[in-house]
A protein has these predicted regions:
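Membrane helical hairpin/interfacial module
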Residues: 264-324, 331
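Alpha-helical multi-pass membrane segments and their bilayer interfacial helix-loop junctions
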Residues: 248-252, 293-296, 300-301, 498
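Long, contiguous internal "core" modules enriched in hydrophobic/ aromatic residues
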Residues: 245-249, 253-260, 271-280, 315-316, ...
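Short, Lys/Arg-enriched, Gly/Pro-containing loop segments at transmembrane-helix junctions
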Residues: 219-223, 433-436, 499-509
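Juxtamembrane interface elements at the cytosolic ends of transmembrane helices
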Residues: 217-235, 240, 302-307, 355-366, ...
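Juxtamembrane/interface segments at transmembrane-helix termini
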Residues: 300-303, 426, 493-506
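Non-ligating segments of multi-cofactor redox enzymes
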Residues: 1-247, 256, 272, 287, ...
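Cytosolic juxtamembrane regulatory segments of multi-pass membrane proteins
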Residues: 199-203, 382-387, 446-453, 511-529
Length: 529
């Protein structure tokens, strides 16, 4: 077997960015896109301050999270370990971007050129197939394939070696077959101390960092400690976690509408078994879910390829959500039209499956620590049920004949609001204990009191008063339901668009140049407290 890997010598890298320029020239990327870039990290505190230069890019993981979430199979892995993107079937959903913990993927929504209008050389080399889709480092796979076809050795022969490695003036970048014990990279990894970035996430990256000679006194390598640090410092910009940008309000709308719509349908279906007059609300629920999906369609880079989202149900939760929707809408429509109990229950189960899929979509995004927590799934599910039940209350408020039903539904919604608040509390506690970017907690924590007051305490008080003073029940239940629904929508909006800071970059060890010893670990912008 062959597994191509790259090794960066942190003692040799001088931060000249020649590899970045070579990559840009070789691959004709847009000015703001750097498949290979070099981080400039300050280590220590005055007066003992040093700088470490760290080349980063796609790690070509053995277990790539980007490939697992891709709904279209555009992201694939070759037998030699190189992770590729098929630009012709990528829809530009950016799911792979939020799943990558190395910030190695880019999505260019429209062509950009260095000086505004395109120059002739830019026109000639521009690759329009990359516009609106994901792109990243390819390890210069075309050069590797050329070399193998012509009997050359990638990593040793320049014509079959990645451009960044060829251009490195300090001989800090190396490329070769990590599965070959006699290769150049295998020898380096045996003779030098090394680590891999974010290895604790289980991605098995193919990019190694060496930082000195082995010795008997050094402690064994361990996972990077979550070192508390002040977020937003100038010296850690570009290194600490940054807010993801591609999943914006349009993506948040899908989670909001999906939760409200499926939750409302579940209430409508089960209540409709005994009160058929409420079944018309089910069509409103379907319209809300459809609205969220329609807004999402406007977000993707290549919307005309949306049908490709159905290609990978075996791995991608986004594909599973789409397949569930494909069966959910016709079955739910038929169930509401006929009122058949079996169809109503079946459609309600599909609605629950759709809601669960939305939670799993976030959980599978390994690149966003606030999403990959297992507790995000119960938070999304309970929030969806509470939102749907909350909207159900004002919907039935104008009908006096449904007053006894409203009282029972209000009690159920109150319980769901309590469960949602419990899920929220457990979720925040889990984030603090597991470790997340400092700014994620800075965003989420201020909303705790607001969420509990407006999304739990006030609605429960209104429901309690309405249950005692029956003459005020309908308006109070309606207001309580709206409070619960709005609180859930706000939580999802914040979670998707405001608290979604990426993994950032981290070094298990930093080199002490010339000593062969390891320095301190670096993980700026993170905290466990």
């Amino acid at each position: 077997m062959t597994r191509w890997a790259m090794v960066a010598d942190l003692e040799r890298c001088v931060g000249c960015q020649t590899c970045t320029a070579a990559c840009r020239h070789s691959n004709a990327t847009s000015p703001a896109v750097q498949w290979r870039k070099v981080l400039d990290i300050e280590v220590g505190s005055y007066p003992n301050v040093s700088r470490v230069f760290v080349p980063v890019g796609c790690q070509h993981c053995a277990d790539p999270p980007c490939m697992h979430v891709c709904p279209t199979t555009a992201t694939r892995q070759r037998a030699d370990g190189i992770v590729t993107i098929d630009y012709d079937i990528c829809i530009g959903c950016a799911y792979c971007e939020v799943a990558c913990p190395y910030q190695a993927r880019f999505l260019v929504e429209k062509p950009h050129f260095a000086y505004g209008p395109a120059m002739q050389n830019e026109v000639e080399r521009a690759d329009t197939a990359r516009v609106g889709v994901a792109q990243k480092c390819t390890f210069c796979s075309d050069r590797i394939d050329f070399g193998i076809e012509n009997g050359l050795t990638p990593g040793l022969d320049p014509r079959s070696t990645p451009a960044c490695v060829n251009s490195c003036i300090a001989d800090a970048l190396h490329f070769g077959d990590a599965d070959d014990p006699n290769s150049n990279v295998s020898r380096l990894l045996r003779e030098q101390k090394s680590f891999r970035m974010h290895a604790e996430l289980g991605t098995d990256p193919g990019f190694h960092y060496i930082y000195g000679k082995p010795n008997d006194t050094e402690e064994a390598s361990a996972a990077v400690p979550s070192i508390a640090s002040v977020a937003g410092e100038m010296r850690t910009r570009g290194v600490e976690p940054a807010l993801q940008e591609h999943w914006n309000w349009k993506a948040a709308s899908n989670f909001i509408c999906g939760g409200v719509g499926t939750g409302l349908f579940v209430f409508t279906a089960f209540v409709g078994l005994h009160y058929p007059q409420v079944l018309s609300l089910g069509f409103v629920a379907l319209a809300i879910v459809a609205l969220g999906l329609s807004i999402l369609l406007l977000k993707i880079g290549r919307p005309l390829r949306f049908i490709y989202v159905l290609r990978q149900p075996q791995r991608s939760w986004m594909t599973r959500e789409a397949w569930i929707a494909l069966f959910y809408f016709p079955l739910a429509t038929l169930a509401l039209w006929t009122g058949q109990p079996v169809l109503l229950i079946g459609a309600a189960l599909l609605a629950i499956g759709f809601l669960f899929s939305q939670g799993m979509i976030l959980h599978a995004a390994k690149g966003i620590p606030a999403w990959r927590s297992a507790w995000v799934v119960p938070l999304i599910v309970t929030t969806g049920f509470a939102e749907g039940g909350g909207l159900f209350l004002p919907a039935i408020a104008p009908f006096p004949a449904l007053a006894p039903l409203a009282n029972a539904v209000a009690m159920i919604v109150a319980v769901l609001a309590l469960l949602r608040a419990l899920s929220w509390r457990v979720y925040l506690t889990a984030l603090a204990s597991e470790g997340v970017p400092t700014r994620t907690l800075m965003v989420l924590r201020p909303y705790r009191s607001w969420f509990l007051a407006g999304g739990l305490a006030l609605p429960l008080a209104l429901i309690a008063i309405g249950s005692v003073v029956m003459s005020t029940a309908a308006p109070l239940f309606a207001i309580a339901g709206l409070c619960i629904a709005v609180a859930g929508a706000v939580v999802k909006f914040i979670l998707v668009t405001r608290a979604a800071f990426n993994q950032g970059f981290a070094l298990v060890h930093t080199p002490v140049r010339g000593s062969g010893q390891a320095g301190h670990a670096v993980k700026p912008g993170w905290s466990k407290s």
